[in-house]
Amino acid sequence: MMSNLKLGVEVISARLKPREDYGGVNAYVELRFDDQKVITMTKIDDSSPVWNEKFFFNISDTEDLSNQFLDAYVYNKTSSITKSCLGKIRILGTAFLPYSEAVGLPYPLEKEKWSMFSSAAANGGELALKVFLTDNPSPKVPNLISTKKIPSKSRHKFHNIPTNESNHSPRGNQQSFQPQPPPPQSQTALPPPMMESSLYQAPRFGTPIPTTMGFNPNPPDYSIKETKPILGGGKRARSSDHDLVEPMEFLFIKIVKARNLPSMDLTGSLDPYIEVKLGNYTGKTKHFEKNQNPVWNEVFAFSKSNQQSNVLEVIVMDKDMVKDDFVGLIRFDLNQIPTRVAPDSPLAPEWYRVNNEKGGEIMLAVWFGTQADEAFSDATYSDALNAVNKSSLRSKVYHSPRLWYLRVNVIEAQDLVIVPDRTRLPNPYVKIRLNNQVVRTKPSHSLNPRWNEEFTLVAAEPFEDLIISIEDRVAPNREETLGEVHIPIGTIDKRIDDNRTVPNRWFSLKTENQRRVRFATTRLHLNVCLEGGYHVLDESTYYSSDFRPSMKELLSHKQPSFGVLELGILRIEGLNLSQEGKKETVDAYCVAKYGTKWVRTRTVTNCLNPRFNEQYTWEVYEPATVITIGVFDNNQINSGNGNKGDGKIGKIRVRISTLEAGRIYSHSYPLLVLRPSGLKKMGELHLAIRFSCSSMFQMLMQYWKPLLPKMHYARPLKVVQQEILRQHAVNLVAARLSRAEPPLRKEVVEYISDSNSHLWSMRKSRANLFRLSSVFSGLLGTGEWFQDICRWKKPVETTAIHIIFLVLVCSPEMILPVMSLCLFMLGVWNYRLRPRQPPHMDTRLSFADNIHPEELNEEFDTFPFSSQDPGIVKMRYERLRSIASRAQTVVGDIAGQGERVQALLSWRDPRATSIFMVLCLVSTVVLYVVPFKVFVLLAGLYIMRPPRFRGKTPPGPINFFRRLPAKTDCML
């Protein structure tokens, strides 16, 4: 008897990669379960189809449900009678969940059949399904097409059930059903179902991680958009250094100093400060104690767009314990204030008499100007007059310290003295310290130990001392210092290339109290040098902004600049709340980094649509570099935040080589942040970018030069060592920039430098796997196209290929010219399809738009020690083992194919080797007798022979190759 339990499948959407020979994708999905089959409607010419169709299957045996499975095939309808499989997925019956726990998930499509010589391969992509069990489907379950053979000729119709009421059936005679409202879904769901084609495994340990993310068929708009701002005030010619931003007018008032202010207290003293008042905005200078001639040198800037009064008041106040006393004031009519236009000279301050009977004068200057004014960067802005830490609001320019690689070769030590036990054999090792970097040699059991170990550290100018000490391990947890030496790095030799040899040096060690070691002098033999021929990497090599060496002599002579990069940071629109959700507004500022120059815009407080309109320039030395712009939420404005870091709102990268010289790129870039809750769009950053080339020839010649300095190729660093040194370099840069005023905080430097790019991420692994498949998709597509040529599926095209083949065989000298001409014509053809805007972060390429919460939870987990429950960590380990087992199988198959090639002449299979040797001897005679052109012609015609001359079984050479032995049978 058939049970009332039904299997529901909702086909949501897909993301497909079309084959080049088919052009667009006419996709539909075929579902198979328990000898039943249904198909969706066909989406014409759509690589991202959305169906939202729901189907229900009868379950014949509920007790055997765990042994059943659901197959979903995605087909491309190439014509009215032909189709091609784009991929399939299989979901096991053990993964079927109740409707209240089911969630829509994207499943990666896999090949229908895999073989080294098979052409049936999936092109990649994903299919989003929601699979659930229910005993009360909304409509009556339609008749399903059975996969078993039915003797009668009657046709069975089935009905697809759209999830939207506005969707209609794709077939005219079908009946559309109106589903009843389903029961409310729970906010907590289990991890994704176990399946053969997915990387997920259902957790069997611990508490499942809540999942609130489903597959969103209509994701937010993450694309880059072109904008048309009024740059430079609408002037076409370059009239100033701020022609990439929109002009913003400010009222500037510079308070310089005062003299002969009257005394207010009974003691005859005065604690003066000045209030600058414009409407409801009031700015205050710092106060001086008992000073009637104070010097302030402070600048206030009031936005003209927020002007609330026509009178500016400058009030002199006396700070008191109970209530501040009024000293005097000066009033200015805004209609009489002059306007200064850069690059005019600064307005000279003047003495103004305070409106007070007792006298007193203030030197100040008042004028209208724009953000191009020199006083703009040092001003206190009207939107942040009440901030406690006003220094963190200003725009500043920083420069990274010059970094060097410090190479230390610890050779040997002599005359170690053990005090007080001189008879004990020591267990010494050398410890090297520089900043926060500590390295150690291996222990050596001798009074005259020899190590001969080399270490590389990162040093930053201005240099700190290098501390080298010899430690004696007297117990497992006890060490004694036998002596140490402080080496000023400024006295160390510098090396430009590998041709120069740095001499070794002996250093005398001292004890902690700076006395010579008793009874003898302990000496340490070292080879220390500063490597000036390297570029110290403090960014990822994939999007680095500088590749120049550390030595200044190499900077100026061998790599001059050939262009200028100009960046205009206009504004941000639609900022969301901070990541904690505790702040109602955002105090946003931007940081841009290119080369060694960092720039920081002013902080616009309490604004969700801040306008910056600040412009900066950099010299360009290498086209294959990237400028990084990050947006942050300033949490240092008011006191009480402690060590709370600035919030990350998003960042973008622009590669210089993708920019056309002389063109202004004005676009709005989405600010994307990946959080444990998923991908979030924080707003849109509006930028204007222009790359100006001063020497086109020099820039083109730069493409032929090595990307890194010579020392990186003469004495290359290991990949692991280079990554460790990069982390030290980022820490050094962050430590130095955090000492500036205002400081550029450590979390900002790490976020811009992407210091965590080396950490494990399942999302990045999947993305890189699909990137790899996309790279080889063209090669696989060419192979499939050639197989279609050989099978004569397109007779006209096959005939044309035969003619071209005959021409090239008869005139082999035309092969290389024709290939070069084809590549040239392909480039000309693709010119009309060239990108019109700079590349931006692709959420689909990054697999960030539809990622499972468990993967995000793992990506944001702490390292190297996890903060998750041991059961979850064990589940992740089991999942990683499952992935590694698949990789292990693929690597083993590839190795087996190579071992079969080696087995041709290894005599592991005597008969196979004998056959191959006979074939080689026969082919030698044939190739000697038959002309080469004739041989190539016959071989090509044989390979492209018509189907009637082909068999249905693989050819003999492939059968022979598959029988060759591999070393798989020797594996344990």
UniProtKB/Swiss-Prot annotation:
Ca(2+) 1 binds at residues 265, 271, 318, 320. It is found in: Membrane; Vesicle. Residues 161-173 have a biased composition (Polar residues). Coiled coil: none annotated. Residues 150-159 have a biased composition (Basic residues). Residues 1-107, 232-352, 384-507, 543-669 form the C2 domain. Residues 179-194 have a biased composition (Pro residues). Residues 142-203 are annotated as: Disordered. Expressed in root hairs. The chain crosses the membrane at residues 803-823, 924-944. InterPro entries: C2_dom, C2_domain_sf, C2B_MCTP_PRT_plant, C2C_MCTP_PRT_plant, C2D_MCTP_PRT_plant, MCTP_C, QUIRKY-like. GO terms for molecular function: metal ion binding. GO terms for cellular component: membrane; vesicle. Keywords: Calcium, Membrane, Metal-binding, Repeat, Transmembrane, Transmembrane helix. Ca(2+) 2 binds at residues 265, 318, 320, 325. It is a multi-pass membrane protein. Its cofactor is Ca(2+). Belongs to the MCTP family. May function as a signaling molecule by regulating the trafficking of other regulators. PANTHER family: MULTIPLE C2 DOMAIN AND TRANSMEMBRANE REGION PROTEIN 8, PHOSPHORIBOSYLANTHRANILATE TRANSFERASE ISOFORM 1. This is Multiple C2 domain and transmembrane region protein 8.
